A protein has these predicted regions:
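Acidic, contiguous N-terminal accessory segments
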Residues: 2-181
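Feature activates predominantly on carbohydrate-active enzymes
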Residues: 123, 127, 131-305
Length: 305
């Protein structure tokens, strides 16, 4: 301040060093695959895993006393309580398609699905136990969801093995800590087929995730047929070259500027396809939660209407 009280407009010196910008010629912005491969080779792979070191990990796995481990060649017998017929059918399919194991009426090894013994109380609705030994694999739970989780653990125990499969004599107790274990998929911006959605359901259910967050509406697209509001899909499910957006939305992301092309910019699920997806997911104990964006991120719906 000066004696008169006014500020003096004198700039203060500031030490500032400007570093030269690094361009594409000095930085490896896009590492080649061979460099990534070489880097991956440097990772330590010496850890000795146990048979029960699976993902997701189980709460408890201990050796079963008084029982012997056993081998599974190419066939198993599958028995089950009638309440678990759906889970038995899914297990039969996966044993065949993933591990090449045929389910027959008589075999040295039996897989049995049943309710928990009356003396045992489930921690929650997804609790299950697996007891293996002497040629028997017993999966028990208080609900069909628990049985399904147990079958996914069995499939994981067999992963990474060549025929002949071997199972140790084990006693496994497991349950999830969190009731909501979900995966969000944004198909508003990038559409995909129902077949791909079913594959996703298969994958997430194999890891015991139980929710598919179905993000089907956003600024860039509306992907679900609503009877009586056909314009939501006739306009909102298509992106392409347009000056007025009367027949389709602006390109945004992909679409090849062609609203009729089979790209991730175009497409929607019919009412019947969505119902089929819901049933498919429910069989695998996955809950589908549709999400309608509003009031923000609702441009596709607003333009369409």
């Amino acid at each position: 301040m000066s004696q008169s009280g006014s500020k003096q407009g004198i700039p203060l010196p500031v030490g500032l060093t400007i570093q030269p910008l690094k361009g594409m010629e000095t930085e490896d912005w896009y590492p080649a695959p061979d460099k990534i491969y070489a880097s991956n080779l440097a990772l330590e792979t010496t850890a000795q895993l146990q048979q029960t070191d699976i993902f997701p990990s189980v709460k408890e796995a201990v050796p079963a006393t008084g029982k012997e481990g056993f081998a599974i060649e190419n066939k198993v017998k599958l028995t089950f309580h009638p309440d678990f017929a759906n889970e038995a059918e899914l297990l039969k399919e996966k044993l065949a398609t993933i591990h090449g194991l045929e389910v027959v009426s008589e075999a040295p090894v039996t897989v049995h699905l049943d309710y928990l013994p009356e003396r045992e109380t489930a921690v929650n609705g997804e609790y299950y136990r697996i007891d293996t030994g002497n040629g028997l694999i017993n999966i028990s739970a208080s609900t069909s969801h628990g049985i399904f989780n147990g079958t996914q653990t069995l499939l994981s125990l067999l992963k990474g093995q060549e025929k002949l499969f071997r199972l140790e004599a084990l006693s496994i107790r497991d349950y999830p800590d969190l009731p909501y274990r979900g995966q969000m998929l944004d198909i508003a911006r990038n559409f995909t087929t129902v077949e791909h959605l079913k594959k996703l359901v298969d994958v997430i259910s194999s890891y015991k995730l139980n929710v598919l967050h179905f993000h089907f509406s956003d600024d860039e697209g509306w992907r679900l047929e609503i009877p009586g509001l056909e314009e939501l899909t006739s306009v909102g499910a298509r992106r392409g070259h347009t000056t007025d957006e009367l027949e389709c939305l602006y390109p945004g992301y992909d679409g090849n500027y062609d609203p009729s092309a089979a790209t991730s910019g175009n497409g929607y699920y019919t009412r019947e396809e969505f119902i089929d997806l819901l049933r498919y997911a429910a069989q695998r104990h996955v809950r589908v939660i549709p999400e309608i964006e509003s009031p923000g991120h609702a441009r596709a719906a607003i333009v369409s209407m």
